[in-house]
Amino acid sequence: MFKLLLVLALTMLAQSALAGGGSKSTDTVIRFG
C-alpha cells in the first residue's frame, strides 16, 4: 500500500517537473520527505 503511494508521489513529481514547476516539485519533496 505504501509503495503505491510512493509511486503516485513520484509520478506527480515527474509531471510537475515536466510542466516546469521546479518550485512545486521541491515543495512536494519536502512534504513527502
UniProtKB/Swiss-Prot annotation:
Q: Which UniProt keywords apply?
A: Amidation, Secreted, Signal, Toxin
**KW rRNA-binding (keyword) present:** no
Q: What is its main location?
A: secreted
Tissue-level expression reads: Expressed by the venom secretory cell of the spine. The spine is a cuticular structure containing a single large nucleated venom-secreting cell at its base. It is an independent unit capable of producing, storing and injecting venom. On the back of A.stimulea caterpillars, spines are grouped together by 50 to 100 to form scoli, of which there are eight.
Query: According to its UniProt record, where is this protein located?
Result: Secreted
GO cellular component terms given for this protein: extracellular region
Q: Which GO molecular function terms does the record list?
A: toxin activity
Q: Which stretch is the leader sequence?
A: 1-19
Positions where Phenylalanine amide occurs in the chain: F32
Q: Which family does it belong to?
A: Belongs to the FARP (FMRFamide related peptide) family.
Q: What does this protein do?
A: Is toxic when injected into Drosophila melanogaster. Also shows a low anthelmintic activity against the parasitic nematode H.contortus (drug susceptible Kirby isolate).
Other comments on record: Negative results: has no effect on human neuropeptide FF receptor 1 (NPFFR1), NPFFR2 and kisspeptin receptor 1 (KISS1R). Has mild effect on ASIC1a channels (8% inhibition at 10 uM) and no effect on ASIC1b channels.
Question: What is the designated name of this protein?
Answer: U-limacoditoxin(13)-As11
**What organism is this sequence from?**
Acharia stimulea
